[in-house]
Amino acid sequence: MAKEELIEMQGKVDEVLPDARYRVTLDNGHQLIAYTGGKMRKFRIRILAGDLVTLEMSPYDLNKGRVTFRHIENRTRTTPPARRRH
């Protein structure tokens, strides 16, 4: 499928599920199951309940989506930043 056909939406993570999946409520109230995109999985970007995310969805299946971006504006840091080794 071509990238132009994907629908991009924003939503809030309600629940973290096993196997890097999330229950997300979109801005329009629709709930779906989303999984972490490849680059986010590669760089181990953590997504927690309450995070605002951007999703890509196929127009053929609106019950599944792929998380492509995590917005970090209103979240506080719960762990100290990792130390860099020299």
Curated annotation (Swiss-Prot):
Biological source species: Acidovorax sp. (strain JS42)
Protein family: Belongs to the IF-1 family.
SUPFAM superfamilies: Nucleic acid-binding proteins
Protein biosynthesis is among the record's keywords: yes
UniProt keywords, alphabetically: Cytoplasm, Initiation factor, Protein biosynthesis, RNA-binding, rRNA-binding
Pfam families named in the record: eIF-1a
PROSITE patterns named among the record's database cross-references: S1_IF1_TYPE (PS50832)
GO CC annotations on file: cytosol
Start and end residues of each S1-like domain: 1-72
InterPro entries assigned: NA-bd_OB-fold, RNA-binding_domain_S1_IF1, TIF_IF1
Superkingdom of this protein's organism: Bacteria
Subunit (UniProt): Component of the 30S ribosomal translation pre-initiation complex which assembles on the 30S ribosome in the order IF-2 and IF-3, IF-1 and N-formylmethionyl-tRNA(fMet); mRNA recruitment can occur at any time during PIC assembly.
Protein's cellular compartments: Cytoplasm
Protein name: Translation initiation factor IF-1 3
Function statement: One of the essential components for the initiation of protein synthesis. Stabilizes the binding of IF-2 and IF-3 on the 30S subunit to which N-formylmethionyl-tRNA(fMet) subsequently binds. Helps modulate mRNA selection, yielding the 30S pre-initiation complex (PIC). Upon addition of the 50S ribosomal subunit IF-1, IF-2 and IF-3 are released leaving the mature 70S translation initiation complex.
Molecular-function annotations in GO: ribosome binding; rRNA binding; translation initiation factor activity
Keyword Protein biosynthesis assigned: yes
Gene: infA3
